[in-house]
């Protein structure tokens, strides 16, 4: 074990302490989305509760989207809400392609791209209460306090040895993938509901 001045505690020898803004595991995802045809589901932060998508009814086109609908999820990325006192997190693994193709996120979310072997570790990191507490302390602004990219320089990340990260990923990835698959089934059922409900209300289809 080695004492680390930044964390004020001992850490395993060979592990590193870096900032969330600049570290060997993540890359900040920039705003901007490619053009797309048809409609996509827009997820403002209000449609996310903790780590669950709660509302998929807001549809946008590339031309009619609001300015905040400008973040594109990518495989192997974790996301958290920037605003103070908002416990909202999302992750996208290499198995999340179907969902990624369908949704656009708000600029109220901060996205971090990471290697596949570090996704589960970083997901655990941003879900930790200590991370949320630190985020809330750093948040600034008179009306809607939130953190900005520079604030990420003040959030420390403990970076384990790559062999530890791979071992952790090997054990946790199947659980997250199972969770995602269950959510995706619900996601598809919600889309079917949203498609059929107007037809039912208009008398285009009948039940029974």
Where are these regions (language model features)?
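Sequence-specific dsDNA recognition surfaces
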Residues: 5, 21-33, 43-81, 92-94, ...
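Proline-centric
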Residues: 109-119, 147-178
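Short coil/turn segments at secondary-structure boundaries
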Residues: 1, 33-41, 137-139
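Non-catalytic DNA-recognition/assembly elements of restriction-modification systems
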Residues: 1-32, 158, 162-208
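Alpha-helix initiation and N-capping motif
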Residues: 17, 36, 119, 131, ...
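A short beta-sheet element
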Residues: 69-131, 136-149
């Amino acid at each position: 074990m080695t004492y680390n001045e930044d964390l004020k505690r001992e850490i395993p020898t060979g592990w590193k302490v870096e900032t969330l803004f600049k570290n060997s595991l993540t890359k900040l995802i920039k705003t901007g989305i490619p053009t797309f045809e048809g409609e996509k589901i827009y997820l403002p932060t209000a449609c996310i509760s903790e780590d669950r998508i709660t509302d998929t009814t807001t549809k946008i086109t590339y031309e009619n989207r609001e300015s905040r609908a400008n973040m594109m999820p990518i495989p192997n990325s974790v996301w958290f809400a920037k605003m103070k006192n908002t416990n909202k997190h999302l992750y996208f693994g290499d198995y999340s392609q179907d969902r990624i193709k369908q949704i656009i996120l708000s600029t109220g979310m901060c996205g971090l791209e990471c290697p596949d072997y570090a996704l589960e570790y970083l997901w655990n990191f941003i879900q930790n209460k200590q991370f949320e507490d630190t985020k809330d302390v750093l948040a600034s602004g008179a009306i809607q306090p939130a953190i900005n990219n520079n604030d990420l320089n003040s959030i420390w990340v403990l970076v384990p040895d790559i062999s530890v990260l791979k071992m952790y990923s090997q054990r946790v990835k199947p659980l997250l993938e199972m969770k995602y698959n269950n959510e995706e089934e619900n996601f598809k059922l919600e889309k079917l509901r949203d498609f059929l409900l107007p037809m039912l209300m208009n008398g285009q289809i009948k039940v029974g």
